[in-house]
Amino acid sequence: MTEPLDAALRPKSLAEYVGQARLKEKLGVYLQAAKGRKEALDHTLLFGPPGLGKTTLAHIIAAELGVNIRVTSGPAIEKPGDLAAILTNSLEEGDVLFIDEIHRLGRVAEEHLYPAMEDFKLDIVLGQGPAARTIELPLPRFTLVGATTRPGLITAPMRSRFGIIEHLEYYTPEEIGTNLLRDARLLGFGLTEEAAIEIGARSRGTMRIAKRLLRRVRDYADVAGEKTIELERAQDALDKLGLDTAGLDERDKKYLETLIHRFAGGPVGVDTLATAISEDALTLEDVYEPYLIQLGFIKRTPRGRVATAHAYDHLGLPVGAAESDLGLYTN
């Protein structure tokens, strides 16, 4: 599946978007009000784990408003000149500017963004030293949609300039299944509801992962000469992909087993845990831990990470299991 096809499968309206019910309801009100007043939507910050649809929602916002969208990312805007080029050359009245990973925006560029967000003007410095002068460029009234997986890294001045701040939640297996059935229909292959929900249940509550898994399960079905993906085929393919019934892969299980085995279930600091499993701390915090916390398998405490009774149960271990119970790291 190519990138343009991925874009073609995206929902084009709030009505087509499955999940995030509370967010959809609120966003629908904000969009309707903005259209009724013929105003740009307030600047919007969307945050949550990767793959939950922040980019898709940004495109939906633009589509619902009937305006264009300009897509960029925080790391791509290093200097004020980068920002000026986007704001002065790419945007028309009411357009949406989507900045992914906005927490990685350069600090100087961020400070130049403040007057653009508040007063729709951009201050440009011409020349250097005593001869330098500042000119003020008017900008069209636009909507900035920022997306981040790390809201704690958004500075207070930046956060205060967003009129709408919303968190995206993990999806239920049923919500993911509904979306996958739509994808299968658009792509012209069969998928039963039971198989779709099974894929959803092993997708970490994340739509992006579910779509990737659907492609891989479809590969297995195609090789087997099956035109429709049934539950048994989905289960078999997902098992071969190394995903258990909760959607945990080998890295997730290594995290839990290391926490329980090497550190007696915790508490242990994230840096120490990351070193023990040959991973970096940011990857643990951004990729692995959100879902493990969502499942109730670990807790983040002031003293470090702690495995819960649910984690022991999922691994088939008694709470407080000894090293020999895991059969790992033994001589």
UniProtKB/Swiss-Prot annotation:
UniProt-annotated stretches for the region Head domain (RuvB-H): 245-331
Principal location: cytoplasm
Annotated region (Small ATPAse domain (RuvB-S)), positions in chain: 172-242
GO biological process, one term: DNA repair
Residues at which ATP binds: L9, R10, G51, K54, T55, T56, E118, D119, F120, R161, Y171, R208
Keyword Membrane part of the UniProt annotation: no
SUPFAM superfamilies given in the database record: P-loop containing nucleoside triphosphate hydrolases, Winged helix' DNA-binding domain
Protein name per Swiss-Prot or TrEMBL: Holliday junction branch migration complex subunit RuvB
Gene, per the UniProt record: ruvB
